[in-house]
């Protein structure tokens, strides 16, 4: 169910009402209704769309609460300074789950997200469970029906479970099983967070991955080269970040906290190596769970990640 943006989420410290160099995002954000827009190609500005859904997390036997993530992220983002004043940012609201099956909600979200991806230079999709990734893929494939798609995921988990239905742990298996023209690269894999069956599937499907242990201190030149080659080898790139990849000391508000996760600055550096590419039209950020957050640390981390990628 599509819900329009809530303007009351967008508040913050007011430093000036007249000097744009002192403006914050709550002063410059605009609001839009994707249901009223056609499938047009404009390639300007940035779109925000929330995936206020954690049904996939529930189906994956995780701890729920991520459906409140999009609004928590927007609240935290609203008060950050607008340092990229040349790019218009439009909040298109959220999609909520009210269908019998999760896949039907994913398709509804995909239809709306596709309009934003088509219309804007980049679209940030805010979750919500990581089942957002399959919806993001459906949207990407709608916009680019013939293109090769490179899926880059910063995540502690492969999320390639074989369940026979959509959950937060099945998105990338669904993509690979349905699309011979899609490939998958995962950065941040936890050796303690994936079964041998998932590693076997990764080998079977030629999934490229980097362990979290390899990203503890810096992004090494071989990993940088791997990312660059992967982007180069595909027509379009779908980028997604699961916040459970970040160590729980920095990101307690997630569906599945990481005991040995990677540091926020490493995620920022990885993102900065992906997002500047013109092939990246959509970025999803998943599993931000306000129920378990502390002092809004995780919401602020996600907000700063989006902010960091815009400047």
Curated annotation (Swiss-Prot):
* UniProt-annotated binding residues for Mn(2+) 1: 130, 155, 159, 242
Keyword annotations: Histidine metabolism, Hydrolase, Manganese, Metal-binding
Picking any one GO biological process from the record gives:
L-histidine catabolic process to glutamate and formamide
Record SUPFAM superfamilies: Arginase/deacetylase
A GO MF label: formimidoylglutamase activity
* Pathways involved: Amino-acid degradation; L-histidine degradation into L-glutamate; L-glutamate from N-formimidoyl-L-glutamate (hydrolase route): step 1/1
Tell me which residues bind Mn(2+) 2.
155, 157, 242, 244
Q: Which residues form a coiled coil?
A: none
Catalytic activity line of the entry? N-formimidoyl-L-glutamate + H2O = formamide + L-glutamate
Cofactor(s) for this protein? Mn(2+)
Q: What is its EC number?
A: 3.5.3.8
Classification via CDD domains: Formimidoylglutamase (cd09988)
Is Hydrolase included in the keywords of this UniProt record? yes
This protein's source sits in the domain of life called Bacteria
Q: Which family does it belong to?
A: Belongs to the arginase family.
NCBIfam families listed in its UniProt record: hutG
- Please explain the role this protein plays, according to its UniProt record: Catalyzes the conversion of N-formimidoyl-L-glutamate to L-glutamate and formamide.
Q: Supply the name of the protein.
A: Formimidoylglutamase
Lineage of producing organism: Bacteria, Bacillati, Bacillota, Bacilli, Bacillales
Gene name tied to this protein:
hutG
